[in-house]
Amino acid sequence: LKKLTRFYHPKTIEEACQFLGNGEGRTAVIAGGTSAALRADSSLEALVDISHISELNYINKDAAFYRIGACTRVQDIYKSPDLKGPAGKLLQAAAGKIGSTLLRNAITAGGNLAGLFPWSDLPVAYMALDAEVVCRRGRPKRTVPVMSLIETRAPQFLAANEIIAEIIVPAYGPGTGTAFAKLAKTANDYAIISLAVRLTLKEGVVNQARIAVNAITAQPVRCLEAEKLLEGKALSEELIAEAANKATDSINIRKDIRASEEYRRE
């Protein structure tokens, strides 16, 4: 960060967006700082630290949704007594698999999405839950599907003076089940593969299936062929095995120093 000359500490969303949009060279947002540290972008001239904006740090629930502020720490998600039911279970399972306690106290709900890496764990949970993201430019805001932000990636999706403010997750109820799994060499290591699943059943038949994976690809993707196979059918061990085999059919699996393409596919 040799060109870094300015560091801003806004107290409100409006201030943060103003700093981002003032046109004073290359500027980036940080909250936990872990993504910025890994990328070490040498062209950055200014950082806007939004971690002290209280209106971005919360976990709330209304009748049908959980609302999570973008600066909520992953550790707070993992330990929150307010996250319950199928959605809460999946979010906490994913949060609990992120690194160590030290890292979970730095990484944020929005940062894990904005600073997207192949090993990021929360985004697959957001995708499986059909979450939405609230993006703010001061007072103006827009609500978009998390899939849209992930597919385009935050730096290209967000305007120069725009930040992720909130993640909205449907609470789901009876008839919905969720699961999260992560394979890594150690408990604190990056994922070789991470997987989030949500199945919503109606009268014993899969009404909606969501299967999202990461680490085997450059960014999280849904296993659309496996989802289609499950929907409209009654669950059985044979169907689940067939869906598992089909999950990676249409996915270009990557290789790296942690695992080969063949190992990840298996």
Where are the regions that the model predicts?
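C-terminal structural segment of proteins
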Residues: 1-266
